[in-house]
């Protein structure tokens, strides 16, 4: 029997485990214009250095693994690895740090939010050396954003399609969200649109349930839209929720909406998934449909201050994946949203170029180049008394959506819509005349209520309604 040959390790390979920071913590690194940059809020386990944690985040979300492997020598890790290039303590928080990580562009598939998130917010969030990890912000370079279609149409094209300018758009979510028959649902849509709203909306829960199948809902809503358009002379729409159990079924529903001549469909982009959402966005551009996006499930990901990801990251991801509207909080209503933070990601949705501004939670300057903008939708616990503040906070390029604030009117749905339209027109006129909506808002609403009995009734019903809780999402 011949002697067993001696196997020698290669010169460049040394088996074993080594600290991540030896390879992935590079404080001298100069970021490139093509790098994707990430800001992570880290809470290390006791005794683990911040530099090791930051390097671990960079490693585990790019080329690293827990031990040295032979195949490291078959590629250029220096070209492909993520790099933790800066770490700073979080003011006022014990044992929390912001780690800045740069990723080379070649790590990510073009035009795929799914692939981007699989790397950056993947397994690393379960890493044992970290007690908690939150992705606060991403810088998407133009070299990557140009590989995405983005929103199907964008703000200006939507205004041109609707022939509506110089004011926020008005919407209403049909309530109760579940349980109505298709015919009664269509009746509520008609009454709201006839009263002066621009849009009505399927609730995010409404897909195709036994009490109301999707095709029946689409047909009765189409009838309501055509009837209200004929009576008002305005273009109307209803967000027909195309979200379904499969991508094929989702596209089938969008096709039916197009065949009915409807202007807009809707998708729950987080529960539906980014691959489905991007597919629907491409279909909508090709077929002239606007796309309304609901963010159901977002608070599971973004509500905790030290773990998960901030909504500004989800907002940027949506702009890449595609959507013409997205729910963004209200600042003044029943749902979470601190003013400066909300306005920060609203600008990230709408504007082409947004400067770094840590006072608004914006960690990086973001240049979207020519990617179309997204209209923020303020929705949740708002009513006519909020109209001056909403108009002042969100400006013209927004959708103000009153569900209970329309359908809860004591005289019915159409008077509720009238009250909201009158309040909005009064606020826009007052603003255009140079009045201060923040200071004179209540007076402006009272003046308008003198000649609108519908608005006067709404003011009386909701005069005591407030949602006074401290926001969790603070800087």
Curated annotation (Swiss-Prot):
- List residues, modification N6,N6,N6-trimethyllysine: 14
Cofactor comment text: Binds 1 Mg(2+) ion per subunit.
Localization recorded for this chain is:
Plastid, Chloroplast
Q: Which residues carry this modification: N6-carboxylysine?
A: 201
The protein's UniProt keywords, in alphabetical order, are: Acetylation, Calvin cycle, Carbon dioxide fixation, Chloroplast, Disulfide bond, Lyase, Magnesium, Metal-binding, Methylation, Monooxygenase, Oxidoreductase, Photorespiration, Photosynthesis, Plastid
Please tell me where substrate binds in this chain.
123, 173, 177, 295, 327, 379
NCBIfam families, sorted: PRK04208.1
Assembly and partners are described as:
Heterohexadecamer of 8 large chains and 8 small chains; disulfide-linked. The disulfide link is formed within the large subunit homodimers.
Q: Know the name of this protein?
A: Ribulose bisphosphate carboxylase large chain
Source organism per UniProt: Physcomitrium patens (Spreading-leaved earth moss)
* Organism placement in taxonomy: Eukaryota, Viridiplantae, Streptophyta, Embryophyta, Bryophyta
